[in-house]
Amino acid sequence: MDFGKAIQLLKEGKKLQREGWNGKKQYIELATNISYQNTKGEVINAEHDEIGNKAIAFVGTSGVQIGWLASQADMLANDWKEV
């Protein structure tokens, strides 16, 4: 499938990956209700009316990367699939 369809499915809560990715255990999914802990130990909820509280998370063997950005190759690829 193409990137446009992949984004639609991502918004529906599906996990997606590309056939062309080296690690077969790698995928992206939509992260919601994002919060973080600051240096004082306070949990900060990043809910903002202007920017929302969602981001694309890349999940791989090294852990989770919040705020994954698609490359041009990712956006133009037709090898996206649901996990």
What are these regions (language model features)?
Residues 1-47, 58-64, 75:
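Catalytic phosphate/metal-binding cores of nucleic-acid and nucleotide-processing enzymes, i.e., regions
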Residues 53-83:
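Short, compact, well-ordered microdomains
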